[in-house]
Amino acid sequence: MTYDAVIFDVDGTLLDTSEGLISAVNYTIDVCGLTPLTESQLRTFIGPPIQNSLAKYYDLSPEKIQEIAEIFRDAYKEKFLLQAVPYEGIYTVLDKLVQNHIKVGIATYKREDYALQILEHFHFDKYATVMHGADNFNQMKKKDIIQLCVKEIGLTDPSRIIMVGDSDNDAIGAADAGMKFIGVTYGFGFASKEDVMQFENVGISKNTKDFFNILRQLDIIF
């Protein structure tokens, strides 16, 4: 099988964004007078749309959820967005993909304007042919964001594209888009190899060294 492109998730795949996201959630909970959450509950906010996470823990109307989501997003952008760390070795992986003429895309559930700001800050934009995030009102599914990337990359056969991510949203989005999937267990969603194996995949990576080996086995890099 020949592959032409690799599309990456952001939170838990390219960047460890836990510090900034958890700080922003705690800030929002405090400002809005909501019941505090445990550390393990707070970590579930990393990755999914903020509205989904709020609805999981608070019995509020959709309108109130959206109002709180906007407070969170404003706080995150203004105070906490850049509190993130690139995963060790990820730039080397991206360098190798570009050297092997593999197109790179980025598809994230982060709101698109925030996503572009953080990706440019950490210089991921120099690798990516295309970068897309979510809309303001949580209308887009991960598949929709992925398909935007595929369309702009200009490839017609999605089976020759690999999605890389740390969650079931990434795996399902890839399958719905007709793409292959590599799951990573160093992020926030998948905690183990067994978690990833619930979904069709062409590789499971516990770190970027593993990821290198998978790409070599798939003849994507040399």
Identify the function of each model-found stretch.
Residues 163-203:
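Acidic, Mg2+-coordinating phosphoryl-transfer loop and its flanking beta/alpha structural elements
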Residues 3-91:
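N-terminal helical cap/lid subdomain that shapes the substrate entry/recognition surface
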Residues 5, 142-171:
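Conserved Lys-Pro-Asp/Glu-containing loop-to-beta segment of HAD-superfamily phosphomonoesterases
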Residues 35, 125-129, 156, 205:
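Conserved H-loop
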Residues 125-140:
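A short, structured active-site edge motif that brings together acidic residues
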